[in-house]
Amino acid sequence: MGTPGSGRKRTQIKDRFSAEDEALSHIAREAEARLAAKRAARAEARDIRMRELERQQKELTHRYHDKKWGQIQKWMEDSDHARHLQRSSHRHSMASSRVTPNHRSSSVDVSGSHRGRESISRRRDSVYNTLKDSSRRTSNSYSNSYDVKNTTSSSHRDLLSGLYHDQRKYSSLKYNKPISTHHIRSSSLYSEPLATKRTYGTSLYKDGLYNASSSRAPSEYSCYSSRASSARSSPVCSDDEGSVSYSSCRGRRDSVSSDFSDQSESAADYFSRSNRRGSIVSDVDDVSIPDLNSLDEKTDKQFTTENYSRPSSRNATSGIPGTFTPLSGSSSRRGSGDASCSLDPDASLSELRDIYDLKDQIQDVEGRYMQGLKELRESLAEVEEKYKKAMVSNAQLDNEKSNLVYHVDTLKDVIEEMEEQMAEYHRENEEKSKELERQKHNCSILQHKLDEHKEGIRQRDEFIEENQRMQQRVDSLVREVYDLQETINWKDKKIGALERQKEYFDCIKNERDELRDELTAVKEKVKIGEKHGLVIIPDGTPNGDINHEPMVGAITVVSQEAAHVLESAGEGPLDVRLRKLAEEKEELVAQIRKLKLQKDDERQKSAKNNSTTTDPTGLENGSDLQLIEMQRDANRQISEYKFRLSKSEQDITTLEQNVMRLEGQVVRYKSAAENAEKVEDELKAEKRRLQRELRTALDKMEEMEMTNNHLVKRLEKMKANRTALLSQQ
């Protein structure tokens, strides 16, 4: 692990700074400045993120506490609203369920008199009906108020569920003096309202729907319903039993109405006292609160025993008309002594009412306190959980910080090593750069030589291409010459053919002349035939249809031409002459056909050679001039082609000479370049040798200067010693 804050280890620079070293140091300083700026930016961003996280955590905690406090306030408002509704509904039910003063006075008078059984039974029936009506009205009002309470407290079921199932142990809160059940009816009547009330409260606690403002309506309803059930279960009872039951019901109604009227005042006083003392539980130390489960069991047991043990206890009190059996201590303030109901019934009812009020207030305060305590414990548990999570996250962040510090230190060591490597790389780079400069110089020289060689090769290629073009031109000219020679040969052949044709036509002309001569001879013979008795038909007679008078003797009628032909046929009979003429005619037709075939052959030959054939009539007239002109044209073209051929041959020879000359120049340039390279190498070697000699000469000069200075100092010292010796002498 590297030490933090060790900084960069710079190597000592022995030599002077060069421009490259200064540039590299400037780049390194800029990189360090950028790295420091990045580190500062990262630190600032990290601080901003931490502050943002803290702010978000604070917002979450404030939001959570505000939500809890809002829920508590809403629950308190709903409880106050439900209490107000319950109070108004119970006031209405109590106002409707009150009996007239005449009934009260009659019940009191009956308690001290000994009237007959008929009046007692009638009053008992009236009390039973009144209790039945009041219980019905009370049950209706309770059901309405209970529906209102359910609608107002339905949103808080989850919040108020399990209110009295906290960590506090309620098993320690017991009755100091439990209620004892006696054999008299009055004890059961006075103990039933409390039992039913507590049973209802226990059931509400178990259901999680406890509300301080609605805890008295079920007790009232239980009181009236228990009394009605007891009245129904005992149809035959004494007058004092009926008076006691009626007076107890009336006192309970008065206590209930007074409870609803004085509830707000007593609760306010109690909260003020508890606030002054600083604790809520300290005010209920002297009051015992029963365990809910045990109280529920006791109440059920007591209710069952009272319901099923009344017939046995009915006979025990039938003979005592004007006295009450003393109540067992339902409160710590009444004690355990026996007292008469006729002496102080209102005091016992007021004490019982105070006890109920106090217990209801205690239960209300206890419920609120336990609810607040439960919420505080939940919030405390959540805060502790958040604190643990924060501690864990802080530990993780601390570990991450230590790891990052370790990584930073290792990275600093790596950076130092990299800087050392960078310095080494810079030195190697300088050496390589110098070597690169030398290689670049050599490369530039070689590039110059290469350019020269490329230029020579380019010129050679140009000459070769030009030679190829000239060779192509020569080949084309040779082909043209060959073509001209072929055309000349073709023309010569054509001229020979025309000459032969001319000879053939000359023969035909001779034959024509001969035929003309023969025709004249035949005409003469015809004339001679007329002389021998042959009739010559004149030329104007058509088909010899002239009517001639028959002449004496057998004379054949022929035309003049036929007569000439017959004369030209020779002498002899007419048949022989005609046969001779027919043979001559066939020979002439065969000759004509032969001439036509020759003429067609000549025309086809002339069409193949792209030349026009002359008309036989034209050939007869001007064939010599055409042949002469064609010969002149052919001779002129031949001479022209010969001139071109000679000229192209001269060009070829000149180009070949140029190629040879250029090749010689390329060879000379190559040899000159090689010689120049050799000279350059020699000059470089000479330069290096001279530089070495210069360095050695400079070194020698420095040594000589040093020796000279040393000698001068010795000379001065010797002079000083000499002057000192002379001065001493």
Swiss-Prot record:
Family: Belongs to the LRRFIP family.
Name of the protein: Leucine-rich repeat flightless-interacting protein 2
An example molecular function term from Gene Ontology annotations: LRR domain binding
Source taxon at top rank: Eukaryota
Entry keyword set: Coiled coil, Developmental protein, Wnt signaling pathway
Organism, scientific name: Xenopus laevis (African clawed frog)
InterPro entries with a match to the protein in the record: LRRFIP1/2
Annotated Low complexity bias: 137-147, 257-268
